[in-house]
């Protein structure tokens, strides 16, 4: 208690205490960090900021315009070559930074998710940059990246990367069932994205433009759904972060899996 002298009178004021750390419940932890709470909450997580919204922000800023491009809205084309900058600095870099921060906090699952998806964005952008010379050898002149990106041999080859990413998304999908419904649906949407992209590239490689283009547009639609779910999850986390009296449900899936403590 402190004492203040005003006009010869003493006035007492009680000091207020501001908590320096907050302990989260298992459900709150899984909603904010997108990772099952497998052990006691680390002390560092109670003192520092939550990095997960940073990755979600980078994800939605990248996937939303790219999905519109894949669906050819407003005459857009190029399979995302116009978004090389955002793909590198928003999709790749922000997810990589978040992956490192999640590693420091001990959150293995989001660390792996954000790190691998961020790495994919870097690789995807690098393929379209002429200085990497990834697509140019597939062109008839062996020097044109633009022509190489649309060549049959390149598409037939690059589709294997999408198939591999689809397998990875399936693994993430299974792991995400320990967290919440929204996060699980994001990986389900991404699984469809990579399956449709691989199918589209193989059909285009075979010269079947009609089916190939439909598959690419279907991949764009699935990616758009994933971006909308990402926006929802981002809003839910930021509302909690600033203490708004609005709680958006994300569908906690604890009822399907028993919690294990380590």
UniProtKB/Swiss-Prot annotation:
<feature type="transmembrane region" description="Helical">
    <location>
        <begin position="219"/>
        <end position="239"/>
    </location>
</feature>
<dbReference type="InterPro" id="IPR000791">
    <property type="entry name" value="Gpr1/Fun34/SatP-like"/>
</dbReference>
<feature type="transmembrane region" description="Helical">
    <location>
        <begin position="154"/>
        <end position="174"/>
    </location>
</feature>
<dbReference type="Pfam" id="PF01184">
    <property type="entry name" value="Gpr1_Fun34_YaaH"/>
</dbReference>
<dbReference type="GO" id="GO:0019413">
    <property type="term" value="P:acetate biosynthetic process"/>
</dbReference>
<protein>
    <recommendedName>
        <fullName>Protein alcS</fullName>
    </recommendedName>
</protein>
<dbReference type="GO" id="GO:0006068">
    <property type="term" value="P:ethanol catabolic process"/>
</dbReference>
<feature type="transmembrane region" description="Helical">
    <location>
        <begin position="181"/>
        <end position="201"/>
    </location>
</feature>
<dbReference type="GO" id="GO:0005886">
    <property type="term" value="C:plasma membrane"/>
</dbReference>
<comment type="similarity">
    <text>Belongs to the acetate uptake transporter (AceTr) (TC 2.A.96) family.</text>
</comment>
<feature type="transmembrane region" description="Helical">
    <location>
        <begin position="109"/>
        <end position="129"/>
    </location>
</feature>
<feature type="transmembrane region" description="Helical">
    <location>
        <begin position="81"/>
        <end position="101"/>
    </location>
</feature>
<dbReference type="InterPro" id="IPR051633">
    <property type="entry name" value="AceTr"/>
</dbReference>
<keyword id="KW-1003">Cell membrane</keyword>
<keyword id="KW-0812">Transmembrane</keyword>
<dbReference type="GO" id="GO:0015123">
    <property type="term" value="F:acetate transmembrane transporter activity"/>
</dbReference>
<keyword id="KW-1133">Transmembrane helix</keyword>
<dbReference type="GO" id="GO:0030428">
    <property type="term" value="C:cell septum"/>
</dbReference>
<keyword id="KW-0472">Membrane</keyword>
<feature type="transmembrane region" description="Helical">
    <location>
        <begin position="53"/>
        <end position="73"/>
    </location>
</feature>
